[in-house]
């Protein structure tokens, strides 16, 4: 992107940063080396200037609109064949905390929601009981009953699992599910796109390259996807830059990513969290700097999301001044964060979200993942 933007209101204290900021202002693409340098900034004045710059870039690229959605989360099952060390969600067969819902039961969950919803977000464990036939039926039932509700469903991990379960290429699986009603794909399963880190988090799951291949296939079929980055576990600042680079490269090729989300690892109720209490986290990059550098580096992404239920409302609102332009959703029925003890006691409906956005001097826009 080569858009010229006005000078930010704050200038960095460190002299060598000023020409870098000016280069960004003039539309020069941020390099991996410079992205790493920005992530490692520690001086308060430099940090404030970085966040301010990202806010100005956001304003130039996408204006003052802040998106939000009314989302119902559906979880067909949490039984899973994988043993991901960072996961607080999964259960093994026979575990009393496990569950399984039929497509009809999930349709009833939608019917019981009192607030209007714009989309359903569907993810589950990887288990033979939730196969291609199951999801084809589920999506078809939802679209028949609620044709205007956007279906955002299944991560790259689940599509790879369905491929191995049925011995059918992912492209064919995506085609079948798109015909059944699939509208977009969430970004889960990315974590950090560096295989040595992925092997620590989830041994035996798909590689970074395979994750990107599945998203590329979806893009080629006209299915937009989200992308995520999970931070504060075993990743280094260099790994963060590698992750952003790989996403930017695929976006240059396909333009199929609709949104980028930074997630904070929850170190409660999982094996990795217990380890990290002894080992510590390998960096102390402020979340606002992660958002700011992501906005500057991902110059081909329009929408960056601040997950208020992950960050807390106050921090999420700060993110809106560091490059974010999406406050996520109402998160009705959300369980993954809740089971990781990350759930915040505050509940937001669509009116509450709109009011918060307006108080920041921004323009609220209710939407779904079809548009952002």
Name each model-derived stretch.
Residues 66, 87, 139-143, 147-162, ...:
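Mobile, glycine- and charge-enriched loop segments
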Residues 93-228, 233-242, 246-249:
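Conserved Radical SAM active-site core
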Residues 38-41, 71-74, 124-128, 231-234, ...:
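Conserved short loop/turn motifs at secondary-structure junctions
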Residues 27, 54, 84, 122, ...:
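Conserved, mostly hydrophobic/aromatic
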Residues 61, 145-149, 221, 254, ...:
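Helix C-cap/helix->beta junction micro-motif
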Residues 1-43, 108, 245-372:
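Auxiliary Fe-S-binding modules of radical SAM enzymes
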Residues 49-93, 98-123:
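N-terminal pre-triad scaffold of radical SAM enzymes
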């Amino acid at each position: 992107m080569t858009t010229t933007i006005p000078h930010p209101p704050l200038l960095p204290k460190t002299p060598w940063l000023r020409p870098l900021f000016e280069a960004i202002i003039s539309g020069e693409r941020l390099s991996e080396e410079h992205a790493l340098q920005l992530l490692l900034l520690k001086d308060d004045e430099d940090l404030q200037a970085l966040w301010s710059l990202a806010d100005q870039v956001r304003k130039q690229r996408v204006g003052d609109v802040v998106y939000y959605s009314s989302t119902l989360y559906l979880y067909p099952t949490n039984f899973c064949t994988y043993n991901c060390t960072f996961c607080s969600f999964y259960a093994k067969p026979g575990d009393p905390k496990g569950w399984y819902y039929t497509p009809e039961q999930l349709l009833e969950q939608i019917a019981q929601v009192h607030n209007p919803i714009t989309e359903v977000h569907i993810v589950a464990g990887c288990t033979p009981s939730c196969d291609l036939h199951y999801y084809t039926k589920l999506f078809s039932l939802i679209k028949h009953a609620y044709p205007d509700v956007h279906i955002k469903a299944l991560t790259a991990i689940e599509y790879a699992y369905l491929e191995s379960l049925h011995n059918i290429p992912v492209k064919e699986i995506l085609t079948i599910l798109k015909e059944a009603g699939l509208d977009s794909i969430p970004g889960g399963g990315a974590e950090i796109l560096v295989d040595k880190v992925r092997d620590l988090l989830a041994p035996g799951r798909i590689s970074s390259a395979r994750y990107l291949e599945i998203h590329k296939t979806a893009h080629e079929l006209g299915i937009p996807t989200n992308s995520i980055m999970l931070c504060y576990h075993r990743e280094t600042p260099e790994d963060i830059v590698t992750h952003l680079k790989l996403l930017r490269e695929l976006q240059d090729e396909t333009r199929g990513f609709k949104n980028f989300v930074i997630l904070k690892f929850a170190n409660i109720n999982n094996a990795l969290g217990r380890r990290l209490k002894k080992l510590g986290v390998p960096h102390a990059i402020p979340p606002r700097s992660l958002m700011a550098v992501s906005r500057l580096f991902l110059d081909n992404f329009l929408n960056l999301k601040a997950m208020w239920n992950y960050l807390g409302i106050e921090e999420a609102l700060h993110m809106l001044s560091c490059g974010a332009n999406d406050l996520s959703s109402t998160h009705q029925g959300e369980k993954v964060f809740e089971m990781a003890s990350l759930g915040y006691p505050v509940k937001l409906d669509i009116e509450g979200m709109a009011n918060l956005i307006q108080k920041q001097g921004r323009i609220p826009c209710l939407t779904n993942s079809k548009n952002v």
